[in-house]
Amino acid sequence: MKSIKLRLVIHYLPMIMFTIIASIIFKLFTSVTDTIVFTTDVSGYISVFFLSITLLIGPFNLIFRRKNPLSTDIRRDIGIYGGILAVIHSVVGLFAHLRGRPWLYFVKETETGFVINLDNFGIANYTGLLATLFIILLVAISNNASITALKASKWKTLQRTSYLMFILVIVHSIYYREVLPEKEILTSIYMFIIALIIVIQLVGMRLKLAKG
């Protein structure tokens, strides 16, 4: 395992630089002027990019017949960084559309009180919230202490919730595409990446089963 200082330099610094460059490009090619909306959008897109990489490392190791250890520094750090961006996306996003009334992301106000919001907007937000909770769990156990405390089998079981998290992200993306059609182009690119990940994951699963 590399030292934290070395990981900050060779893992986190390049990811931060990528985030800055991607944010500048996003700013140049979109008409978003609101800082909160911009931060919500860019943190969401970039977080999915990094979280996607963590789901691709395992299948690629199988495809190219490389060792596929329980945990590696690079996969762990990419997951942590992507998870931090996802949490930023979720927190800042609560102030993107309903300024000062974040509860309306999840409930509707009626004459008699509040009811659970189950339209496209509500489903998008509930799936996003659940995905964020799973991400927080995954980030929290992304360390050697958790592997030691939980033991490898239990830790791996919890780690597999990353697949459920990603399904929730897909649903979240689909429903927000319906709610915010003006983001259709970016969301389409987003969905293409997700589809690519699913295909590669299936290839990896097939190779794993064939390997026995």
Residue spans of the language-model regions?
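Membrane-embedded alpha-helical bundles that constitute the cytochrome b-like, heme-associated redox core
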Residues: 1-212
